[in-house]
Amino acid sequence: MRKRRHPLRRLLSHLKHHQFTVILASLCSILNKFWDLAPPILIGMAIDVVVQREESFLANYGYPDPNEQFLILVGITVIIWVLESLFEYWWGILWRNLAQTAQHELRIDTYNHIQNLEMQWFSEQSTGGLMSILNDDVNQLERFLDQGANDLLQLATTITVVGGIMFILAPEVALLAVIPVPIIVIGSFIFQRRIGVRYKKVREEVGELNSLLNNNLQGITTIKSFTAEDRESERVNFASQSYRNANRDAIRLSASFVPLIRMAILFAFTANMLVGGWMALDGELDVGAYAIIVFITQRLLWPLTRLGQTFDLYQRAMASTTRVLDLVDTEI
C-alpha cells in the first residue's frame, strides 16, 4: 500500500498552477515581517545616540553630530514604515485573493468530480456529509490560506531574524532567550498531533449532524405522517451533543496550550532582562544594545503565544484538506 502524502503537500500539489502567486505572497509576508522587526533596532540606535553622542554607532560611519544622527534615524524610520505598509498591503491582497480563488476552484473541482461518479457510490454516501465537505471543509481551507499561511511564515521569519540579531549583539543573553524556543516548538508539534485526531473527530461529527438534519428536513412529511417528531428530535439532540462533546475535547486541549507557553516565555524574558542588565551595568554591553535586546526579545517570544492558535487553524485546515482531496481522488 502506497504511503499517504501529507495533507499540506497534497494541497500545494493541487494549487501548483498558482505556484508563482504562492511564492510571491510568501515573499511579501517575509519582507513585511522583516521590516516590522526594525523599530526595536531604531529605538536602540536612538538611545545609543543620546548616551554615546559623538561616539555612537552612527558616528563611526561619518556622522559625528548627534542632531544629524537623529535626522538620519527619522529618515530611515519613514522608509522602513513605508516598506512595511506596502508589503503588508501586498501580502494581504495576494493571500486573500489566492484563498478566494482556491476556495472556488476546490469547490467546483470537487462538485464536478462527484457529479461524474456512479449512482451506486451515491447510495453509500450521506447528502449532509457531502454538503459538509463542499461547504464547511472548503471554507476552512479558505480561512487557512487567508491568514494562517501568512502567520506561519511570519513566525518563522521572526525567530530567524530576531535570533540572528541577538546572537550578534550578545550571544550569552541570546542563549537565554532561545532556550525555550525548541521546547515550545517541539511541544507545539506534539500538540498538533494530539489535536489533529480530535479535529478529525469534530469534522466527522459535523458531517453526521448535517446528514441527519438534511435527511430529516427532506423527509419532514414522512416524519409527521408517522408522528415521529419526538424520536427524530432525540436523534438530532444526540448527534448535536456528540458534535458538542467532540468540540469540547478539542477545546480542552487547545485552551491549555497558550498558558503553558507563557510560562516558558516568562523565564526567557526575565532572565534576559536580568543578565542583560548586569552586563550593561558592568560595561560589557552597550546601553543601546541592551535596549534592543529587551525590546526585541518581546518580538521574538510574544508571537509564540499565538503558536497554538496558528497550529489550531493549520490542523483544522489539514483535516479539511484530507476530506476534500480524498473526495476529489475518489475513482470514477
Q: Where are the language model's segments positioned?
A:
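Alpha-helical segments in transporter systems
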Residues: 9-12, 20-45, 73, 77, ...
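Transmembrane helices of ABC transporter permease
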Residues: 21-31, 150-201, 272-285, 302
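Hydrophobic alpha-helical membrane-associated segments
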Residues: 31-35, 39, 75-99, 161, ...
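Loop segments that connect adjacent transmembrane helices in multi-pass transporters
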Residues: 125-128, 201-249
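Cytosolic ends of transmembrane helices, especially the final helix of ABC transmembrane type-1 domains
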Residues: 228, 252, 269, 300-327
